[in-house]
Regions:
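DEDD superfamily 3′-5′ metal-dependent exonuclease/proofreading module
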Residues: 1-131
């Protein structure tokens, strides 16, 4: 799984750190986001999926019908559940908008994760001393 290797890439690639430790300035739903952030406790890169904001801040989602019960879309299973909710549930328009926004951010981050992996490999392949 890409999500399993992404933290390692982010922790060991100075190229990735330098490029993504500032607002990206491109993209659609992550344009102003900083993908590479340092954990204040251990100095390692924070998993960018954990930086995705909660969808239902200020809304009671105690029922287990919404995603993981916490209102997060941080993995493929939650994304599939969210998409299913959009297709087959009678949702309040505010909740529907929040789910769509969350799915768009999650999907863009998933695509960006593939780009990070590619950029890391490309940097290593072009580097005289990759290790």
């Amino acid at each position: 799984s890409l999500k399993a290797v992404l933290p390692t890439i982010m922790n060991h690639s100075a190229f990735i750190k330098n490029k993504y430790a500032q607002p990206m300035g491109y993209g659609t739903h992550l344009r102003s986001e900083i993908v590479w952030q340092k954990n204040k406790n251990n100095g390692k890169a924070v998993d960018p999926y954990k930086l995705l904001p909660p969808l239902f801040e200020g809304i009671d989602i105690s029922s287990d019908t919404y995603l993981d019960g916490k209102g997060q879309i941080r993995d493929g299973a939650a994304a599939m559940m969210a998409y299913m909710l959009l297709q087959f549930s009678d949702l309040d328009s505010d909740i529907r908008k929040r789910i769509v926004k969350g799915l768009l951010k999650y999907c863009e981050l998933d695509t960006l994760a593939m780009v990070l992996l590619y950029e890391h490999w490309k940097f290593l392949s072009e580097s005289k001393y990759p290790c």
